[in-house]
Amino acid sequence: MEATCRRALEIGLPAIAFTEHADFVAVHEGQHGLDVAGYLESVDRCRARFPELRIICGVELGEPHLHPEAAALVLSAGRIERILGSVHCVTIDGRPRDLSERGLMTTESPPALFRLYLAEVLNLARSGQPFTVLAHLDYARRYWPHDQLPLDEAAFEEEYRAILREAARRGTVLEVNTTRGVEPVRGLCPGPRVVRWWWEEGGEQVSFGSDSHEPGRIAAGFAAAAAGVEAAGFRPAPDPTAYWRR
């Protein structure tokens, strides 16, 4: 985290938001729950060491609508300023599967899995869980076999718009995620077309995330993301740390 703060200052960022994962289903070997106390201590150390950098303390709740008690426990444990809600897993044959699992997204199943994923995101949006930002709305696109089957967002427009309408109704912020830098084929998560649908459905605010996971990737792809979001009808606020608005 300290290396990330140093990198933020090197590239001229006025602020950085740490949004550590709090996932409640162990789908990867060696996966552990979030040590909230240890995380908050690390944030405090960074704030003391880098007073010139605004450091926002956040958390990304994975499928909190399926694990409401565990999610509430995380949020009650300390001072969380920014709460993201996300979906990584879908239920297949009675068990949760993360779409990042190698081979899960095959050319035989992508459309069905994509719809299954978006249906779970809609469940999250409707859940009433206390998250402010909807993170990487179409996380599944990261694992779509783009080299074998082009992803046409228009084929899923109905599912996308149902999520966006519900998110707008509850006042949610839509995150545009660059996945550590915009890869030309995969693109943004979600892409400009979906961000425009967000605007059309009444969405008010947009945030940016690089999902960096390492210091060298923070803010990667933000210039391209900002251009796409601006083209969709959203504008930056005077405060560079604030959400963009319509």
What are these regions (language model features)?
Residues 16, 44-46, 84-87, 110-115, ...:
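Short, surface-exposed, polar/charged, turn-prone segments marking secondary-structure boundaries
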Residues 16-18, 55-59, 83-85, 133-135, ...:
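Hydrophobic faces of well-ordered beta-strands that scaffold small-molecule active sites
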Residues 60, 66, 88, 139, ...:
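Residues that form or immediately flank small-molecule/cofactor binding pockets and catalytic motifs
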